C-alpha cells in the first residue's frame, strides 16, 4: 500500500491532555485508508465518555459503507449528549476519496490544491 502521512492530535480544554470530546481514528485495510473525526458535544469527562464510545464503535465497524457506518454510530450514541462526525475512505489504488459527515464538521485535503469538504444536508 502507498505510504500515507496522517496525524491525530487531541488537546483538552481543561484536565488531562487526552481527556476531551475530540477523537480520530485511522485504519488501513485492503489498499484503502479509513479516517474519521469525532467531536462530542461539550467539554470534559462527559464529552470524553461519548468520544470513547464513538471511537469504539468506529473501530469495530470501519469497513462498513460510510452511510451505514454513520447511521449505526447515530444509533450507538442515542441517549448520550451526542457528537458530530466525519468519515472518509481513500482508495489508495485510484486516489478516489469518499466522504460523509453529520453535523458542523469538515475535513481538509492538502496537496497541490487545498480543498475543504463540508457536510451538507
Where do the protein language model's features map onto the residues?
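Catalytic core of PPM/PP2C metal-dependent serine/threonine phosphatase domains
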Residues: 20, 48-115
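N-terminal entry segment of metal-dependent catalytic domains or homologous docking segments
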Residues: 1-53, 106-110, 116, 121
Amino acid at each position: 500500500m502507498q505510504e500515507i502521512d496522517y496525524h491525530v492530535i487531541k488537546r483538552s480544554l481543561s484536565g488531562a491532555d487526552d481527556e476531551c470530546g475530540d477523537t480520530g481514528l485511522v485504519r488501513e485495510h485492503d489498499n484503502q485508508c479509513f479516517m474519521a473525526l469525532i467531536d462530542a458535544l461539550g467539554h470534559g469527562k462527559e464529552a470524553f465518555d461519548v468520544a470513547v464510545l464513538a471511537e469504539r464503535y468506529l473501530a469495530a465497524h470501519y469497513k462498513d459503507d460510510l452511510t451505514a457506518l454513520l447511521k449505526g454510530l447515530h444509533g450507538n450514541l442515542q441517549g448520550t449528549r451526542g457528537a458530530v462526525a466525519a468519515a472518509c475512505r481513500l482508495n489508495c489504488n485510484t486516489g478516489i476519496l469518499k466522504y460523509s459527515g453529520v453535523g458542523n464538521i469538515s475535513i481538509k485535503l492538502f496537496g497541490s490544491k487545498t480543498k475543504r469538504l463540508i457536510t451538507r444536508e
